[in-house]
């Protein structure tokens, strides 16, 4: 009975960690090819937003200009204008199919994210006692660590997340969130978030760390400041 109680939280934690990848893989394997074929067969003209529509139109214009210049450089081939327009049409269809596939994958990612949130929320409500066991395990693990290891772990995590060398990681994370929700990446918005959000998070974490260390053990505050300096 004790082994079963110990195994259940581990299974629950593994389920939460691997659930998003499993759902995305299943959706992509079962529905990805079918949705792609249906979308391309129906020649859908749906765009997710105005920015993406503008981006596709600009790329199609660039493609037409590139093919036009390429035909000018190949004057000796004497390509017929009708063949030139046919080539543009084929390239445009191929380009739109590639764009449609990226949109479909984006929709699948967004759908799996929403499904994962719903399932995890349901498990949080349904298996609340399992979360209590996980919480007690984590607290026991933290209490068994020495003061120096606790402070070192806190400094390592804060430096990795909000240190001076972490802006590139924030850019990648915010960019991936943009892609998951179907937004076109805007460098100005991303740079603004990277320059402001970590600062706010750093202030909140420092305040929380000070209160936590001061409540657990005042000696931890001294060790924290000594290592941090």
Swiss-Prot record:
Q: Where are the transmembrane segments?
A: 7-27, 106-126, 189-209
Q: Which UniProt keywords apply?
A: Hydrogen ion transport, Ion transport, Membrane, Plastid, Transmembrane, Transmembrane helix, Transport
Q: Does the keyword Plastid apply?
A: yes
- Extract one GO cellular component term from the record: plastid membrane
Task: Give the highest taxon in the source lineage.
Answer: Eukaryota
Q: What is its main location?
A: plastid
Give the GO terms filed under biological process for this record: proton transmembrane transport
Cellular localization per UniProt: Plastid membrane
Q: Its topology with respect to the membrane? A: Multi-pass membrane protein
What reaction(s) does this enzyme catalyze?
K(+)(in) + H(+)(out) = K(+)(out) + H(+)(in)
Q: Per its database record, what is this protein's job?
A: May be involved in proton extrusion.
Query: Which family, according to UniProt?
Result: Belongs to the CemA family.
Q: What is this protein called?
A: Potassium/proton antiporter CemA
